[in-house]
Amino acid sequence: MSVMEPLSANRTAQFRTLEREARFVSPPKDKSAYPLLYEAVEPHVGSFNALTEGPGGGLLNLGARDIGAKVVFDGKASDENPNYLGNKLALSVTQVSLTKPMSNDGVTAAAERNVFPAEARKRLTTYRGKLLLKLNWSVNDGEETFSEVRDCGPLPVMLQSNRCHLHKMSPQELVEHKEESDELGGYFIVNGIEKLIRMLIVQRRNHPMAIIRPSFANRGTSYSHYGVQIRCVRPDQTSQTNVLHYLNDGQVTFRFSWRKNEYLVPVVLILKALTDASDREIFDGIVGADTSNSFLTDRLELLLRGFKKRFPQLLNRRQVLQYLGDKFRVVLQASPDMSDYLVGQELLRRIVLVHLGDENTDKSNMLMFMIRKLYSLVAGECCPDNPDATQHQEVLLGGFLYGMIVKEKIEEYLQNIKLQIQADVNRGMPVDFKDRKYMTRVLTRINENIGSKLQYFLSTGNLVSQSGLDLQQVSGYTVVAEKINFYRFISHFRMVHRGSFFAQLKTTTVRKLLPESWGFLCPVHTPDGSPCGLLNHFAHKCKISTTQSDVSKIPTLLYSLGVSPAAHVTAAGPSLCCVQLDGKIVGWCSHEQGRIVADTLRYWKVEGKTDGLPLDLEIGYVPASKRGQYPGLYLFGGHSRMMRPVRYLPLDKQDIVGPFEQVYMDIAVTPEEIQNNVHTHVEFSPTNILSILANLTPFSDFNQSPRNMYQCQMGKQTMGTPGVALCHRSDNKLYRLQSGQTPIVKANLYDDYGMDNFPNGTNAVVAVISYTGYDMDDAMIINKSADERGFSYGTVYKTEKIDLSLSRGRGDPVTQHFGFGTDEWPKEWLEKLDEDGLPIIGSYVEEGDPICAYFDDTLNKTKIKTYHSSEPAYIEEVTLIGDESNKFQELQYITIKYRIRRVPQIGDKFSSRHGQKGVCSRKWPTVDMPFSETGIQPDVIINPHAFPSRMTIGMFVESLAGKAGALHGIAQDATPWTFSEEDTPADYFGDQLLKAGYNYHGNEPMYSGATGEELRADIYIGVVYYQRLRHMVNDKFQVRSTGPVNSLTMQPVKGRKRHGGIRVGEMERDALIGHGTSFLLQDRLLNSSDYTQSAVCRECGSILTTQSSVPKIGSMVTIRCRRCAISFDEAKKIITQQDSEDSIFIDDSHIWEDGQGNKFVGGGNTTTVAIPFVLKYLDSELAAMGIRLRYNVDPK
């Protein structure tokens, strides 16, 4: 396709039915037919592959090298010799390797066999390989060295990575191994569940960013809100953030965080420790030729004088390093035999600008550049960088995060060995470093299982880390790769989250769609609601680099283009342009020269003839401006960068651009927009800014934007086809559409991604007409005959696990066995169950039916487990699962897969592909449906009021295109932006309809199904692709008359699963009060809830002091008030004290007994009232706090 070729050249897609069928019957034996699918998942797979392959033996080996050695001594200091250390032992890991998943089935010394992912899914286990570490220990600096390979437990392995058996398999072989023909990988299988590490947005690596943050001022008395922050990344992808703070007295402080603690160091201390530079050299390095800038020179003078004043004793580099070493010895856990000077060097290596390794001169140059940038920010010469802009962001890939955690766990492992030996030394136990047996004894006491910690991370998404890994969150790293349908599945791999820290922020600035993200993040595909703008998806052409480009020859190229090397130039003024390569200052040149260098490099890299200049090199030239971004030429070739292809006009070839450089480039969207001497690039297609899902919305350029956002969400909730190999999966719940079709109207990308292998809906004849009145409020009417012929007929598969071993302890003998015993049991059970006690495949089960039988040795009795769901089902499949740790144990664990039929019901949710969702309100008999002159009856009727306010014109266009496509037997291309104001879709598809003998506008005269008369208006009717969503009334309806209640409050429990009730909340109560329906209110809130009858005393008004008396022979139980009654003995005393003639005679009927033999008199003035039980509960709770409730009782 040449640059000027119009985009609308070919508007007819192909159905490719036979080609697809042939590919389905015999999958390709070489490579996949859909390379785009693999590209979509590449960032995940590529980042995991980088752990074990690449420079230095992969990231895990680089990480092990970076950890270095842990040192321990076997000597104990005494009073005579306080510095005695003894023999020195240095522990290190020299090699890390990961095997492919294997299993010996619990039989020791047996040959291992390959384990494939389908088995892990089916058996609900974890797909994992062994993590092997080569542990080295040397005594007294190499006097004797030993090494041993340690098995650190099984580590979960990513599918389709280089450690997976499926790697490089052809579609044919994948099918043979019970996978989809295009198994993408990119996820892990943990306990049978597919888990995915989601991508996160982090700050761009190795680039100093000027920030104004009010929280900076809270760090201390004279701190200001100005700072320069750099996130430095080591070769093993772990990062360390360094920040420079500006203080109001002109000082600058260097801040870093180590093991979740923050430390602040004066920046001059760091500069003096890096090189033996004099004050004059530091002054020149920061000010350069800009000596007239009094703002800068005054502050620098304060900075240097302040250092002299505060640390007069530090005169040279050695003293500074010793001072730093002394202060940070404990923090860095340095070994006792290291001098302070060496600890100071270790501090610089581990914390200060770690991406520059041990190059202290480069670090010093970079630090001076950062100080200069900080002063420019304070002076207002440059603006702060926006951390929310894609320009200053990169992606934290799942594989790299996984590697970081493994590295940290290896370091903890070494630390634990060291602590164990130290504990032995302190206890005075015999310690011999040269004895291999002693070391073996130590190692057996250490928990070596690193794999289980990674499995915990994947299954919960929680990060347990000592250092925090320089990240802002501790949870939410993993998600389940749900296979509701294929759209949902593929979206997981293109999803990128801003971080859970930002979800709690009250401000909306982080959620805004910024123009910098053009072509990298999709503007449409983000959820509505709380994660809006935080959870984004990549544009479908956006790639993420998982390898480091070879940039070793670039400095030489730059010098040949007129850049002066950094070593020769001390000046750092704004008159010069700083040239940086991956965070290292290469040299300086003038701003005019900088632009020429950038343009020349771009021409050369696209031309591809210059050796050592990779195509994906990012060339970000920031021109000098007044109060704009800090100028310079920044080159990037590292990992984790977002990249996308555009066409480079001077050479008419593909160029790869990144978000940093794109801001300062002129890229035309369409060839028509190109202006000479302005635009250097043009987009391959305007749809490159959209994600995969947003591209599949037909004619999305005709819709109002929120509707396209809704469709991106609803496409993922569709009851579609999650995959073809459903019989080899045991998901808790799977949705499947039985009658899926290929859409007549589809975007070109639909075929490129092979979406026809996973149909997601049905082509329906849709009439837009207000008919029957059942279509109000977005409801839709379905033709009863269409429903009977299978319109949107779906199935739900549910899996139930039955484990007999749960009731017995570990190591106990098996007491429960599947099958029938010799005791008596109902013979009807055999109608549903086989002789082995397992259900018959294909049998129909209802609530209460037996699903398996087992014999219990302890009770000598046959028992059954029953089907609990109220929805009838068919037994689809029974899987017998063996024990992982013991191959020969008898069967204890099975899974049963149920097939539940789901015919569209009234109340089920449907939607078109334009965010037009609605529920089915009626299934209308065919005889009563309106029909057209050609005898066509609509499958679906929707109300015309659904369109005006929502402005989904794309649905009208789809209806036209679908009708024309159905009449001519062609597929229609619905790619956005193929039409224009002059060339409209109404004309294009209208002509097709005319040729087929239909109305140009898509309207047709229709006849009433009830009377047979022609309707007065012509009806808009056409073919629209409809999706059935997973929100079905059968999963949602909740109804109960009586059922379980809460034991404390006696009110109905909540939750549909537990047969709970529906809560009448405050709003509902207010509505009932507002309507004056007091009887309804009493019925709902009392009689139907926690109605109870309680005795209350009329005199003291208490419900807690009443109790029933012990009945006498021939008399009824009476309710008495314990508080108002007096004891029988007291009553007798009162009588004997009264000497008057009319002394009271106690009547027998007044005397009553409580349950403990105590006699009382009186307290009989009680009555029974109806109250909510929760009132009784409240009363007793208040009584516990010493508060008495008194009720006024009507004497009647």
Curated annotation (Swiss-Prot):
Listed GO MF terms: DNA binding; DNA-directed RNA polymerase activity; ribonucleoside binding; zinc ion binding
Protein's UniProt name: DNA-directed RNA polymerase I subunit RPA2
Assigned keywords, A-Z: DNA-directed RNA polymerase, Metal-binding, Nucleotidyltransferase, Nucleus, Transcription, Transferase, Zinc, Zinc-finger
Any Pfam family matching the protein: RNA_pol_Rpb2_3
Designated gene of the protein: RPA2
Organism of derivation: Eremothecium gossypii (strain ATCC 10895 / CBS 109.51 / FGSC 9923 / NRRL Y-1056)
Function of the protein: DNA-dependent RNA polymerase catalyzes the transcription of DNA into RNA using the four ribonucleoside triphosphates as substrates. Second largest core component of RNA polymerase I which synthesizes ribosomal RNA precursors. Proposed to contribute to the polymerase catalytic activity and forms the polymerase active center together with the largest subunit. Pol I is composed of mobile elements and RPA2 is part of the core element with the central large cleft and probably a clamp element that moves to open and close the cleft.
Enzyme class: transferase
Example of a GO biological process term: termination of RNA polymerase I transcription
Subcellular localization, as worded in the UniProt entry: Nucleus, Nucleolus
Catalytic activity: RNA(n) + a ribonucleoside 5'-triphosphate = RNA(n+1) + diphosphate
Residue intervals of every C4-type zinc finger in the record: 1097-1124
EC number: 2.7.7.6
GO CC annotation: mitochondrion; RNA polymerase I complex
Transmembrane annotation, as ranges: none
PROSITE patterns the record matches: RNA_POL_BETA (PS01166)
Disulfide bond entries: none
Subunit architecture: Component of the RNA polymerase I (Pol I) complex consisting of 14 subunits.
Main location: nucleus
Record-stated family: Belongs to the RNA polymerase beta chain family.
